[in-house]
Amino acid sequence: MFRVTTLLLAVLTATPVFAQLASPNKAGVSMGHLHYVVRDVDANKRFWVALGGTPDTFNGAVVVKFPDVLVFLTQGESTGGTDGSIVNHVAFRVQTFSAVEAAGLKVARLANFPGVGSTNTPEGERIELFENAALNLTFTQDAGYKDATAERHNRPLPIPIAFHHVHLYLPAGKVAEAKAWYTKMFDGVPGKRSNYDAVDLPGINLNFSENPKPTVSTKGRMLDHLGFEVQDLQAFCKRLEALGIKFDEPYAKAAAGTASARLTDPWGTSIELTEGLRSATSTRR
């Protein structure tokens, strides 16, 4: 198994990445990246660019940039797609499906949910899409929370596309536990996205559902891991360690000042924490 974390750190060190990540929350956390392992990098790059991203290439690695998230594409063989892993799918907001279709992508609409649909990558990954007409985008914060950033879900999308959520399919009885874990570890805002329990971080809404079928870790799947960008990552890692987190890959700093660490949540979601991704980005879209 190749080391996608090491590759990403090398990429960030060697070359600036141009993207627009969300400003961090009080704990210094925001969404950073999705890292896919694919057989055909070029075909997948064309898909993500057609969806609305901007491509770049760094020392053999490919990244497609979106508001709030970077999509990294690494060539390799995975053990399967997101379906069957703890992270069932990811989702983006778009203004209209017609704009996506005009770019040459097919959108399968859900008849019972206006404004909700999906498109598929060349290797079969389902990417959920919500247009502004969708009725189930709203995020209601739990009592005692009033976060202005989380209110973005309750307004029309003012730009062509932005990252929206990842959806975790959890074992029975684990939804409340997962919601509490992400709230505590990353200082997230708990609430409900439509009828789903959820936790909001700048740039990402984490949705939780019970799943009767067993799931596996994201490690080695096509979506190998999620990435959060963190300010003062070393101190943040020490805080997580004090809370009992065991790191798969401990905090490491590269020559150019970027840093990373990697952990797995209690249900198998592999999460890379990075620092320096934001300072290497640009507001250019």
Regions found by a protein language model. Give the residues of each.
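Core segments of cupin and vicinal oxygen chelate
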Residues: 26-28, 32-71, 115-121, 167-209
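A short local loop/turn or secondary-structure capping micro-motif enriched for an aromatic residue
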Residues: 79-83, 135-138, 213-218, 279-282
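Structured core of small recognition/catalytic domains
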Residues: 176-253
